[in-house]
Swiss-Prot record:
GO biological process: embryonic body morphogenesis; epidermal cell fate specification; formation of anatomical boundary; negative regulation of transcription by RNA polymerase II; positive regulation of transcription by RNA polymerase II; regulation of transcription by RNA polymerase II
Sequence ranges of Polar residues compositional bias: 145-163
Name of encoding gene: ceh-16
Compositional bias of kind Low complexity: 20-39
Name under which the protein is recorded: Homeobox protein engrailed-like ceh-16
Length: 187
């Protein structure tokens, strides 16, 4: 018996699946029916056996939507010492005027458009990435400072869920429930 919402029912195809034809070496790729052929001419049996939603994905095919990887920097030896260090760009030291202007812009809008970022970079004599990173850091700092979790409750390494008051209350509630249930089943 197949239940209306059972696994067998969900996974079963609502349409009868045609039996795939397997091409023999004598069969050329052009003679394969379009239902079973992929764009490169090879048999595509899977696409005929499963509904179309199986092959859909929530990820975009655009190259910019994929994972971002930082470019690795080459290490150079430092002469006689023989040790190698990674070159790092020095930290940007913003002038007071630049900081005032960045703070003013941040109060107006926490997010900049690309055009506004370009204009601001030109006006302040900075590059766009410096402005972008300043805004990212400022948003992160604001989020951290306005967090609802009190600072003294946070662990410096990892949070301990056993120290949370709602969990202790939950344990007490479950213990009380167990007592009530135990009394209900006593003869």
């Amino acid at each position: 018996m197949i239940l209306k919402f059972g696994i067998e029912r969900i996974l079963s195809s609502p349409y009868p699946c045609p039996s795939p034809t397997i091409s023999t070496p004598a069969t050329s790729p052009s003679s394969i029916s379009p239902t079973f052929a992929s764009p490169n001419g090879t048999p595509n049996i899977a696409s005929s056996m499963y509904p179309a939603w199986v092959f859909s994905t929530r990820y975009s095919d655009r190259p910019s939507a994929g994972p971002r990887h930082r470019k690795s920097r080459k290490r150079e030896s430092t002469g006689s010492s023989g040790s190698s260090e990674e070159e790092k760009r020095p930290r940007t030291a913003f002038t007071g005027d630049q900081l005032d202007r960045l703070k003013t812009e941040f109060r107006e809008s926490r997010y900049l458009t690309e055009k506004r970022r370009q204009e601001l970079a030109h006006e302040l004599g900075l590059n766009e990435s410096q402005i972008k990173i300043w805004f990212q850091n400022k948003r992160a700092k604001l989020k951290k400072s306005t967090s609802s979790v009190p600072r003294d409750r946070c662990s410096s390494v990892t949070p301990n869920p056993h120290n949370h008051p709602s969990i202790h209350g939950g344990y007490q509630l479950m213990a009380q429930l167990a007592k009530v249930q135990a009394r209900a089943y006593m003869p």
